[in-house]
Protein backbone atom coordinates (compact mmCIF):
# COMPACT_ATOMS: atom_id res chain seq x y z
CA UNK A 1 0.00 0.00 0.00
CA UNK A 2 2.35 2.74 -1.18
CA UNK A 3 1.24 6.35 -1.27
CA UNK A 4 -0.12 7.21 -4.70
CA UNK A 5 1.09 10.37 -6.41
CA UNK A 6 0.90 11.82 -9.90
CA UNK A 7 4.66 11.80 -10.39
CA UNK A 8 7.61 9.43 -10.23
CA UNK A 9 11.16 10.00 -9.09
CA UNK A 10 13.88 9.31 -11.60
CA UNK A 11 15.46 6.98 -9.06
CA UNK A 12 12.61 5.34 -7.15
CA UNK A 13 14.63 2.31 -6.08
CA UNK A 14 17.26 4.37 -4.24
CA UNK A 15 14.64 6.23 -2.22
CA UNK A 16 12.75 3.03 -1.41
CA UNK A 17 16.00 1.36 -0.34
CA UNK A 18 16.98 4.36 1.82
CA UNK A 19 13.61 4.36 3.59
CA UNK A 20 13.76 0.58 4.11
CA UNK A 21 17.28 0.75 5.55
CA UNK A 22 16.26 3.51 7.95
CA UNK A 23 13.30 1.39 9.06
CA UNK A 24 15.79 -1.39 9.84
CA UNK A 25 17.73 1.02 12.04
CA UNK A 26 14.53 2.17 13.77
CA UNK A 27 13.19 -1.37 14.26
CA UNK A 28 16.50 -2.54 15.75
CA UNK A 29 17.25 0.63 17.75
CA UNK A 30 20.62 0.94 16.01
CA UNK A 31 23.48 3.20 16.98
CA UNK A 32 22.92 6.56 15.29
CA UNK A 33 19.16 6.44 15.67
CA UNK A 34 19.27 9.89 17.33
CA UNK A 35 20.18 11.43 13.98
CA UNK A 36 17.17 9.83 12.29
CA UNK A 37 14.70 11.13 14.87
CA UNK A 38 16.29 14.58 15.03
CA UNK A 39 16.43 15.14 11.26
CA UNK A 40 13.29 13.45 9.96
CA UNK A 41 9.53 13.62 10.46
CA UNK A 42 6.84 11.12 9.39
CA UNK A 43 5.97 13.39 6.44
CA UNK A 44 9.48 12.83 5.04
CA UNK A 45 8.73 9.18 4.20
CA UNK A 46 7.13 8.32 0.86
CA UNK A 47 5.48 5.01 1.82
CA UNK A 48 2.50 5.20 4.18
CA UNK A 49 3.56 2.12 6.22
CA UNK A 50 6.92 3.75 6.84
CA UNK A 51 5.16 6.91 8.03
CA UNK A 52 3.17 4.86 10.55
CA UNK A 53 6.20 2.94 11.80
CA UNK A 54 8.32 6.05 12.13
CA UNK A 55 5.65 8.07 13.92
CA UNK A 56 5.06 5.32 16.48
CA UNK A 57 8.78 4.73 17.03
CA UNK A 58 9.50 8.45 17.43
CA UNK A 59 6.66 8.96 19.92
CA UNK A 60 8.01 6.18 22.13
CA UNK A 61 11.60 7.39 21.69
CA UNK A 62 10.60 10.86 22.92
CA UNK A 63 9.00 9.24 25.97
CA UNK A 64 12.33 7.51 26.65
CA UNK A 65 10.60 4.19 26.04
CA UNK A 66 12.04 2.86 22.77
CA UNK A 67 10.38 -0.27 21.42
CA UNK A 68 11.91 -2.55 18.81
CA UNK A 69 11.17 -5.55 16.64
CA UNK A 70 7.81 -7.24 17.05
CA UNK A 71 6.95 -4.88 19.91
CA UNK A 72 7.08 -1.94 17.51
CA UNK A 73 4.91 -3.82 15.01
CA UNK A 74 2.26 -4.50 17.66
CA UNK A 75 2.32 -0.85 18.77
CA UNK A 76 1.70 0.30 15.19
CA UNK A 77 -1.11 -2.23 14.65
CA UNK A 78 -2.73 -1.17 17.93
CA UNK A 79 -3.10 2.38 16.60
CA UNK A 80 -4.83 1.24 13.41
CA UNK A 81 -8.55 0.84 12.97
CA UNK A 82 -9.71 -2.67 13.83
CA UNK A 83 -11.20 -3.08 10.34
CA UNK A 84 -8.01 -2.06 8.52
CA UNK A 85 -6.82 -5.63 8.03
CA UNK A 86 -5.09 -4.98 4.71
CA UNK A 87 -2.76 -2.39 6.24
CA UNK A 88 -2.02 -4.69 9.18
CA UNK A 89 -1.17 -7.55 6.82
CA UNK A 90 1.08 -5.32 4.76
CA UNK A 91 2.87 -4.13 7.90
CA UNK A 92 3.51 -7.73 8.98
CA UNK A 93 5.04 -8.59 5.60
CA UNK A 94 7.13 -5.43 5.65
CA UNK A 95 8.39 -6.08 9.18
CA UNK A 96 9.34 -9.64 8.29
CA UNK A 97 11.51 -8.35 5.44
CA UNK A 98 13.07 -5.69 7.67
CA UNK A 99 13.93 -8.06 10.51
CA UNK A 100 15.37 -10.70 8.18
CA UNK A 101 18.33 -8.39 7.56
CA UNK A 102 20.50 -8.80 10.61
CA UNK A 103 23.00 -6.04 9.89
CA UNK A 104 21.41 -2.57 10.27
CA UNK A 105 23.08 0.54 8.78
CA UNK A 106 26.02 2.05 10.66
CA UNK A 107 26.23 5.73 11.64
CA UNK A 108 28.02 6.77 8.44
CA UNK A 109 25.43 5.05 6.26
CA UNK A 110 22.58 6.48 8.35
CA UNK A 111 23.82 10.01 7.69
CA UNK A 112 23.76 9.37 3.93
CA UNK A 113 20.36 7.66 4.06
CA UNK A 114 18.82 10.51 6.05
CA UNK A 115 20.13 12.96 3.45
CA UNK A 116 18.58 10.95 0.59
CA UNK A 117 15.18 10.70 2.30
CA UNK A 118 15.16 14.37 3.34
CA UNK A 119 16.02 15.64 -0.14
CA UNK A 120 13.37 13.39 -1.70
CA UNK A 121 10.83 14.73 0.78
CA UNK A 122 11.68 18.35 -0.04
CA UNK A 123 11.46 17.61 -3.76
CA UNK A 124 8.07 15.95 -3.28
CA UNK A 125 6.72 18.84 -1.20
CA UNK A 126 7.95 21.39 -3.75
CA UNK A 127 6.14 19.53 -6.52
CA UNK A 128 2.95 19.42 -4.45
CA UNK A 129 3.39 23.13 -3.66
CA UNK A 130 3.81 24.01 -7.35
CA UNK A 131 0.73 21.98 -8.27
CA UNK A 132 -1.32 23.75 -5.60
CA UNK A 133 -0.18 27.19 -6.79
CA UNK A 134 -1.05 26.28 -10.39
CA UNK A 135 -4.51 24.99 -9.49
CA UNK A 136 -5.38 27.94 -7.23
CA UNK A 137 -4.41 30.70 -9.64
CA UNK A 138 -7.67 30.17 -11.53
CA UNK A 139 -9.73 30.70 -8.37
CA UNK A 140 -8.12 34.00 -7.38
CA UNK A 141 -10.26 36.96 -6.51
CA UNK A 142 -8.73 40.40 -6.79
CA UNK A 143 -9.55 41.38 -3.20
CA UNK A 144 -7.68 38.32 -1.89
CA UNK A 145 -4.57 38.68 -4.03
CA UNK A 146 -2.24 40.15 -1.37
CA UNK A 147 -3.26 37.55 1.19
CA UNK A 148 -2.75 34.81 -1.39
CA UNK A 149 0.78 36.02 -2.15
CA UNK A 150 1.63 36.16 1.55
CA UNK A 151 0.33 32.61 2.10
CA UNK A 152 2.34 31.36 -0.88
CA UNK A 153 5.50 33.01 0.45
CA UNK A 154 4.97 31.59 3.95
CA UNK A 155 4.41 28.05 2.66
CA UNK A 156 7.41 28.21 0.34
CA UNK A 157 9.74 29.54 3.06
CA UNK A 158 8.63 26.73 5.40
CA UNK A 159 9.53 24.11 2.80
CA UNK A 160 12.93 25.67 2.08
CA UNK A 161 13.78 26.04 5.76
CA UNK A 162 12.83 22.44 6.47
CA UNK A 163 15.68 21.46 4.16
CA UNK A 164 18.13 23.24 6.45
CA UNK A 165 16.84 22.03 9.82
CA UNK A 166 19.48 20.55 12.07
CA UNK A 167 18.14 19.81 15.53
CA UNK A 168 20.31 18.44 18.30
CA UNK A 169 19.45 17.81 21.93
CA UNK A 170 21.89 18.72 24.71
CA UNK A 171 21.67 17.36 28.23
CA UNK A 172 21.04 19.96 30.92
CA UNK A 173 24.17 19.05 32.88
CA UNK A 174 26.30 19.63 29.78
CA UNK A 175 24.83 23.12 29.35
CA UNK A 176 25.25 23.79 33.08
CA UNK A 177 28.94 22.82 33.01
CA UNK A 178 29.60 25.24 30.13
CA UNK A 179 27.81 28.09 31.90
CA UNK A 180 29.59 27.40 35.20
CA UNK A 181 32.96 27.56 33.43
CA UNK A 182 32.09 31.01 32.03
CA UNK A 183 30.86 32.26 35.42
CA UNK A 184 34.14 31.13 37.02
CA UNK A 185 36.13 33.03 34.37
CA UNK A 186 34.22 36.21 35.14
CA UNK A 187 34.77 35.61 38.87
CA UNK A 188 38.53 35.39 38.24
CA UNK A 189 38.44 38.67 36.33
CA UNK A 190 39.28 37.10 32.98
CA UNK A 191 37.99 38.62 29.74
CA UNK A 192 35.22 36.42 28.39
CA UNK A 193 35.38 35.93 24.63
CA UNK A 194 33.21 32.91 23.97
CA UNK A 195 33.41 33.36 20.20
CA UNK A 196 35.91 34.71 17.68
CA UNK A 197 37.28 38.11 18.63
CA UNK A 198 36.37 41.05 16.42
CA UNK A 199 39.84 42.48 17.00
CA UNK A 200 38.41 45.38 19.03
CA UNK A 201 38.44 45.01 22.81
CA UNK A 202 35.49 47.29 23.58
CA UNK A 203 33.32 45.64 20.95
CA UNK A 204 34.22 42.20 22.33
CA UNK A 205 33.19 43.34 25.80
CA UNK A 206 29.70 44.00 24.42
CA UNK A 207 29.38 40.95 22.16
CA UNK A 208 31.67 38.30 23.71
CA UNK A 209 32.89 37.73 20.14
CA UNK A 210 31.26 36.20 17.07
CA UNK A 211 29.57 33.02 18.29
CA UNK A 212 28.49 29.94 16.30
CA UNK A 213 24.92 30.09 15.04
CA UNK A 214 24.70 33.89 15.11
CA UNK A 215 23.74 36.21 12.25
CA UNK A 216 25.46 39.60 12.55
CA UNK A 217 24.46 42.47 10.25
CA UNK A 218 26.82 45.41 9.61
CA UNK A 219 24.81 48.29 8.14
CA UNK A 220 25.71 51.72 6.77
CA UNK A 221 25.18 54.06 3.84
CA UNK A 222 27.54 53.65 0.85
CA UNK A 223 31.08 54.92 1.37
CA UNK A 224 31.10 54.49 5.14
CA UNK A 225 33.53 51.57 5.21
CA UNK A 226 31.35 48.45 5.35
CA UNK A 227 33.66 46.35 3.18
CA UNK A 228 36.74 47.65 4.99
CA UNK A 229 35.26 46.67 8.35
CA UNK A 230 34.39 43.21 7.04
CA UNK A 231 37.98 42.80 5.86
CA UNK A 232 39.21 43.87 9.31
CA UNK A 233 36.97 41.21 10.89
CA UNK A 234 38.16 38.63 8.35
CA UNK A 235 41.82 39.40 9.03
CA UNK A 236 41.32 39.23 12.79
CA UNK A 237 39.48 35.90 12.65
CA UNK A 238 42.00 34.30 10.29
CA UNK A 239 44.83 35.04 12.74
CA UNK A 240 43.01 33.34 15.62
CA UNK A 241 42.04 30.02 14.05
CA UNK A 242 44.07 26.89 13.28
CA UNK A 243 45.26 27.18 9.66
CA UNK A 244 45.52 23.39 9.36
CA UNK A 245 41.88 22.67 10.13
CA UNK A 246 39.88 25.93 10.08
CA UNK A 247 38.88 28.46 7.45
CA UNK A 248 37.14 31.83 6.99
CA UNK A 249 34.88 32.25 3.94
CA UNK A 250 34.36 35.66 2.32
CA UNK A 251 31.63 36.04 -0.32
CA UNK A 252 32.13 39.28 -2.24
CA UNK A 253 29.30 40.21 -4.58
CA UNK A 254 30.61 43.72 -5.27
CA UNK A 255 34.43 43.56 -5.44
CA UNK A 256 36.75 41.15 -7.22
CA UNK A 257 38.96 38.91 -5.10
CA UNK A 258 42.10 40.86 -6.05
CA UNK A 259 40.51 44.06 -4.74
CA UNK A 260 39.71 42.32 -1.45
CA UNK A 261 43.29 41.09 -1.15
CA UNK A 262 44.63 44.54 -2.06
CA UNK A 263 42.62 46.13 0.76
CA UNK A 264 43.71 43.42 3.17
CA UNK A 265 47.34 44.00 2.18
CA UNK A 266 47.06 47.76 2.75
CA UNK A 267 45.42 47.10 6.12
CA UNK A 268 48.18 44.69 7.14
CA UNK A 269 51.05 46.91 5.91
CA UNK A 270 49.39 50.20 6.99
CA UNK A 271 50.42 51.66 3.65
CA UNK A 272 48.44 52.59 0.55
CA UNK A 273 49.31 52.00 -3.08
CA UNK A 274 47.95 51.74 -6.61
CA UNK A 275 49.47 49.66 -9.38
CA UNK A 276 49.45 52.71 -11.66
CA UNK A 277 51.82 54.66 -9.38
CA UNK A 278 55.28 53.13 -9.72
CA UNK A 279 56.94 55.73 -7.51
CA UNK A 280 54.57 54.93 -4.66
CA UNK A 281 55.17 51.18 -5.13
CA UNK A 282 58.92 51.78 -4.96
CA UNK A 283 58.53 53.76 -1.74
CA UNK A 284 56.54 51.07 0.09
CA UNK A 285 57.81 47.96 -1.70
CA UNK A 286 59.48 46.34 1.34
CA UNK A 287 56.48 46.95 3.60
CA UNK A 288 54.13 45.43 1.02
CA UNK A 289 56.27 42.32 0.48
CA UNK A 290 56.67 41.74 4.22
CA UNK A 291 52.95 42.17 4.83
CA UNK A 292 52.06 39.88 1.94
CA UNK A 293 54.31 37.15 3.33
CA UNK A 294 52.44 37.40 6.65
CA UNK A 295 48.94 37.07 5.21
CA UNK A 296 49.31 35.01 2.02
CA UNK A 297 48.94 31.69 3.86
CA UNK A 298 46.09 32.70 6.16
CA UNK A 299 43.15 30.24 6.05
CA UNK A 300 40.82 32.41 3.95
CA UNK A 301 38.78 31.46 0.90
CA UNK A 302 37.34 34.21 -1.31
CA UNK A 303 34.32 33.86 -3.57
CA UNK A 304 33.75 36.80 -5.91
CA UNK A 305 30.48 36.47 -7.82
CA UNK A 306 28.39 39.39 -8.97
CA UNK A 307 25.27 37.25 -8.58
CA UNK A 308 24.80 34.53 -5.98
CA UNK A 309 21.71 32.66 -4.82
CA UNK A 310 21.12 31.33 -1.33
CA UNK A 311 21.47 27.77 -2.59
CA UNK A 312 24.82 28.57 -4.23
CA UNK A 313 26.10 30.06 -0.96
CA UNK A 314 24.94 27.00 0.94
CA UNK A 315 26.51 24.67 -1.64
CA UNK A 316 29.89 26.40 -1.28
CA UNK A 317 29.78 26.26 2.53
CA UNK A 318 28.79 22.59 2.36
CA UNK A 319 31.66 21.79 -0.01
CA UNK A 320 34.29 23.54 2.12
CA UNK A 321 32.86 21.93 5.27
CA UNK A 322 33.80 18.51 3.92
CA UNK A 323 37.50 19.27 4.43
CA UNK A 324 37.68 22.20 6.89
CA UNK A 325 35.94 23.68 9.91
CA UNK A 326 34.16 26.82 8.68
CA UNK A 327 34.75 29.22 11.57
CA UNK A 328 33.30 32.39 10.03
CA UNK A 329 31.29 33.31 6.92
CA UNK A 330 31.24 36.91 5.64
CA UNK A 331 28.88 38.18 2.94
CA UNK A 332 29.32 41.54 1.20
CA UNK A 333 26.54 42.39 0.90
CA UNK A 334 23.10 41.05 1.80
CA UNK A 335 20.94 42.99 -0.67
CA UNK A 336 23.02 41.73 -3.62
CA UNK A 337 22.17 38.11 -2.82
CA UNK A 338 19.36 36.53 -4.83
CA UNK A 339 16.95 34.34 -2.91
CA UNK A 340 16.32 32.19 -5.99
CA UNK A 341 17.42 31.97 -9.62
CA UNK A 342 13.99 33.37 -10.47
CA UNK A 343 12.17 35.38 -7.83
CA UNK A 344 8.75 34.10 -9.03
CA UNK A 345 7.07 37.47 -8.54
CA UNK A 346 8.25 38.03 -4.97
CA UNK A 347 8.57 41.66 -3.95
CA UNK A 348 12.08 42.77 -3.01
CA UNK A 349 11.01 43.01 0.63
CA UNK A 350 9.74 39.43 0.55
CA UNK A 351 12.97 38.28 -1.10
CA UNK A 352 15.14 40.04 1.51
CA UNK A 353 13.05 38.39 4.22
CA UNK A 354 13.78 35.00 2.69
CA UNK A 355 17.49 35.87 2.47
CA UNK A 356 17.86 36.97 6.10
CA UNK A 357 15.84 34.02 7.40
CA UNK A 358 17.93 31.60 5.34
CA UNK A 359 21.26 33.11 6.41
CA UNK A 360 20.20 32.69 10.03
CA UNK A 361 19.26 29.08 9.24
CA UNK A 362 22.69 28.54 7.61
CA UNK A 363 24.44 29.91 10.70
CA UNK A 364 22.64 27.35 12.84
CA UNK A 365 23.01 24.52 10.34
CA UNK A 366 26.77 24.93 9.94
CA UNK A 367 27.27 26.07 13.56
CA UNK A 368 29.24 29.13 12.51
CA UNK A 369 28.76 32.91 12.78
CA UNK A 370 27.68 34.69 9.60
CA UNK A 371 28.44 38.39 9.19
CA UNK A 372 26.57 40.17 6.40
CA UNK A 373 26.84 43.79 5.31
CA UNK A 374 23.61 45.64 4.51
CA UNK A 375 22.70 48.96 2.94
CA UNK A 376 20.76 51.61 4.84
CA UNK A 377 17.97 53.51 3.11
CA UNK A 378 18.30 57.15 2.04
CA UNK A 379 15.85 58.15 4.79
CA UNK A 380 18.80 58.43 7.14
CA UNK A 381 20.11 61.48 5.24
CA UNK A 382 16.84 63.34 5.77
CA UNK A 383 17.23 63.41 9.55
CA UNK A 384 19.20 66.16 11.25
CA UNK A 385 21.82 63.98 12.95
CA UNK A 386 21.58 61.11 10.40
CA UNK A 387 21.96 58.65 13.26
CA UNK A 388 20.77 55.25 11.99
CA UNK A 389 17.94 53.25 13.51
CA UNK A 390 16.76 49.70 12.82
CA UNK A 391 13.97 50.80 10.48
CA UNK A 392 16.60 52.34 8.17
CA UNK A 393 17.66 48.91 6.96
CA UNK A 394 17.01 49.15 3.25
CA UNK A 395 14.33 46.80 1.89
CA UNK A 396 14.64 45.44 5.39
CA UNK A 397 12.11 42.63 5.26
CA UNK A 398 12.75 40.90 8.57
CA UNK A 399 16.50 41.60 8.87
CA UNK A 400 16.12 43.28 12.25
CA UNK A 401 14.12 40.30 13.56
CA UNK A 402 16.38 37.59 12.13
CA UNK A 403 19.73 39.12 13.09
CA UNK A 404 21.24 38.37 16.49
CA UNK A 405 23.24 41.60 16.27
CA UNK A 406 22.88 44.75 14.18
CA UNK A 407 25.87 47.11 14.05
CA UNK A 408 25.71 50.54 12.40
CA UNK A 409 28.74 52.45 11.13
CA UNK A 410 28.02 56.11 11.89
CA UNK A 411 29.99 59.25 11.04
CA UNK A 412 29.26 62.80 12.15
CA UNK A 413 27.56 65.23 9.78
CA UNK A 414 29.71 68.16 10.88
CA UNK A 415 30.77 69.55 7.47
CA UNK A 416 33.89 71.35 8.75
CA UNK A 417 35.12 68.32 10.65
CA UNK A 418 34.33 66.02 7.74
CA UNK A 419 36.41 68.18 5.40
CA UNK A 420 39.36 67.97 7.79
CA UNK A 421 38.95 64.21 7.92
CA UNK A 422 38.82 64.00 4.13
CA UNK A 423 42.14 65.83 3.96
CA UNK A 424 43.83 63.42 6.38
CA UNK A 425 42.03 60.19 5.32
CA UNK A 426 41.29 59.67 9.02
CA UNK A 427 37.64 59.58 10.06
CA UNK A 428 36.14 59.32 13.52
CA UNK A 429 33.33 56.76 13.51
CA UNK A 430 30.98 55.12 15.95
CA UNK A 431 30.07 51.48 15.81
CA UNK A 432 26.55 51.47 17.22
CA UNK A 433 25.46 48.07 18.49
CA UNK A 434 21.74 48.75 18.10
CA UNK A 435 20.59 45.17 18.60
CA UNK A 436 22.29 42.48 20.66
CA UNK A 437 20.05 39.51 21.34
CA UNK A 438 22.37 37.98 23.93
CA UNK A 439 23.96 41.02 25.55
CA UNK A 440 23.89 44.79 26.04
CA UNK A 441 23.63 47.42 23.34
CA UNK A 442 26.31 50.09 23.20
CA UNK A 443 28.71 52.23 21.17
CA UNK A 444 32.38 51.81 20.29
CA UNK A 445 34.48 54.73 19.02
CA UNK A 446 36.93 53.89 16.23
CA UNK A 447 39.14 55.74 13.77
CA UNK A 448 38.85 54.76 10.12
CA UNK A 449 41.86 55.21 7.84
CA UNK A 450 40.25 55.18 4.43
CA UNK A 451 43.56 55.05 2.53
CA UNK A 452 44.56 51.76 4.18
CA UNK A 453 41.05 50.33 4.83
CA UNK A 454 41.86 50.11 8.53
CA UNK A 455 39.67 50.59 11.57
CA UNK A 456 41.66 51.46 14.69
CA UNK A 457 40.37 51.44 18.25
CA UNK A 458 40.61 54.87 19.88
CA UNK A 459 40.87 53.83 23.50
CA UNK A 460 42.28 50.32 23.61
CA UNK A 461 45.55 48.63 22.63
CA UNK A 462 46.11 46.93 19.31
CA UNK A 463 44.74 43.47 18.60
CA UNK A 464 48.14 41.84 19.02
CA UNK A 465 48.58 43.47 22.45
CA UNK A 466 45.09 42.44 23.57
CA UNK A 467 45.11 38.83 22.50
CA UNK A 468 48.72 37.75 22.12
UniProtKB/Swiss-Prot annotation:
GO cellular component, one term: cytosol
Catalytic activity, EC: 5.6.2.3
SF4 helicase domain: residues covered: 189-462
Main enzyme class: isomerase
Presence of keyword Isomerase: yes
Catalytic activity line of the entry: Couples ATP hydrolysis with the unwinding of duplex DNA at the replication fork by translocating in the 5'-3' direction. This creates two antiparallel DNA single strands (ssDNA). The leading ssDNA polymer is the template for DNA polymerase III holoenzyme which synthesizes a continuous strand; ATP + H2O = ADP + phosphate + H(+)
Effect of a null allele: Probably essential, it was not disrupted in a global transposon mutagenesis study.
Binding site for ATP: 220-227
Gene3D superfamilies per UniProt: DNAb Helicase, Chain A, P-loop containing nucleotide triphosphate hydrolases
Quaternary assembly: Homohexamer.
Function as written in the Swiss-Prot or TrEMBL entry: The main replicative DNA helicase, it participates in initiation and elongation during chromosome replication. Travels ahead of the DNA replisome, separating dsDNA into templates for DNA synthesis. A processive ATP-dependent 5'-3' DNA helicase it has DNA-dependent ATPase activity.
Family named by the database record: Belongs to the helicase family. DnaB subfamily.
Name recorded for this polypeptide: Replicative DNA helicase DnaB
Organism: Mycoplasma genitalium (strain ATCC 33530 / DSM 19775 / NCTC 10195 / G37)
Amino acid sequence: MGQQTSFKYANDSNIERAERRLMQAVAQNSEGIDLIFNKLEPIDFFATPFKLIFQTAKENYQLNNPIIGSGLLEAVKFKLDANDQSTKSELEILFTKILLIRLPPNQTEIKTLVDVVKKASIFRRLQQFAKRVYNEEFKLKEDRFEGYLQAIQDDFVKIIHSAFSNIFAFSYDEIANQEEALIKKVHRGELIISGLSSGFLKLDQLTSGWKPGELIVIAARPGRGKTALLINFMASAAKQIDPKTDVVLFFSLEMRNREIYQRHLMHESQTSYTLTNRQRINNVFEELMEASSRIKNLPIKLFDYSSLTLQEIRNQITEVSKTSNVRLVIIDYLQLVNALKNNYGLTRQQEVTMISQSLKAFAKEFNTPIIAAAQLSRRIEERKDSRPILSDLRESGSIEQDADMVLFIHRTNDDKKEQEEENTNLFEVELILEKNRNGPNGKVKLNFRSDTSSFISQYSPSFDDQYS
